[in-house]
């Protein structure tokens, strides 16, 4: 393992966060705070409770997951796309560093930034609603799994994209709708049986459900299923990344 090379990629990507602090940290925190104000205070005051929890408190895990998902994809996709765009990726591919180490550096940095952002948003949520985490270790487990999984997914998008439009297309047209329809603002159990069955095909449901369970011990699906689905998606992303480097897809042209 070439730790110096991995560390160089990791430090470069982390340094980019400080250069774009408003976009990377401040903007997501402010946007999520507006959700708390609108949905938690304005609308939440008119909703008694959801699954025995006040509405403002209920939406906290979903909003944290919303930010972690979107930022994981954005950080990882732009991180690998920019070297492709300027042509420096050829220097990276010809350097004495394995493909695994390249992925580890980029994905590790993207996941770290998303985890830190998630914790900041969680602390911000405590200013608006009372929070109590019943299972902190499970909370961290789901947070890390989600950040790593969707950073890998973002890495795949960054390699696949051949323009800035495509770089934004998957997050805007696929990931954001899946997140909003994944139980961020409501319990899946509130839906009619037909819609509930369709909703359970959404992988984001299992992430949010497991993450919410770590807070309030309430979930739309069992924790075991949530972990299994998340790990399955993680393995699928790892297989796709392996295939990309094995075939050179969108890397050598």
Indicate where each model-derived feature is located.
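Hydrophobic transmembrane alpha-helices and immediately adjacent juxtamembrane helices
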Residues: 1-137, 141-253
